[in-house]
Amino acid sequence: MKPTILLLAGILMLALCAEGKSSRRVPANEPATLRVHDALFPAPYGAVRIGGYLGEKLDLCIDNRLMAQDIERLVQPFRDKPDGNWGFRSEFWGKWFTAAMMGYGYAPSAEHRATVDRAVRELMATQSADGYIGTYPDSCHLGDWDIWGRKYVLLGLLAYYDQTKETAALEAARRVADHLIAEAGPG
């Protein structure tokens, strides 16, 4: 019985709003104004540190796993484009890099910054003139895991821009997105 009452109350609220009888309705052509401003803001990158055993393990993971990856090995498939009609190597760089940016955000250092700078610089160097960054040859674009991999490239580039404000990464991400839209088309 209670779910039925809640459902009816919800339908009544929707009907009242649709009829314009709600006092909280904002006319369609007028922007809504904020009555209450956000009081909660995220802490700046690097401002929160975890201590103790867990903090030590996090630091070890960041230093010895995330920042110790072989960048050349992660970027090489973007140069060689070996995936053809099968493969999903294009996701590896983006997944690793997004995690590396989280690690850098948690424990920013000059050494970590050099690692992520090098990784993004080397990946962006593989961008073709039309904007594509991926591991598939031209004849296999949009096939198999190509779009999936491009998504991870975009996430990595945007994570880098979010923390560093380096516009080259944002521009590379825009070109990747524009290329995908041009290939896949609207809709």
Tell where the protein language model's regions lie, with residue ranges.
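Low-complexity, Ser/Thr/Pro/Gly-enriched N-terminal "stalk/linker" regions
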Residues: 20-92, 110-135
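Aromatic- and histidine-enriched alpha-helix N-cap/loop-to-helix transition segments
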Residues: 84-98, 111-114, 118, 144-155, ...
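Bacterial N-terminal signal peptides
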Residues: 7-15
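A conserved hydrophobic secondary-structure block that centers on an alpha-helix together
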Residues: 137-187
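Well-ordered alpha-helical scaffold segments within catalytic/enzyme domains
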Residues: 48, 52-56, 95-110, 152-167
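Positively charged n-region of N-terminal signal peptides that target proteins for export
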Residues: 1-4
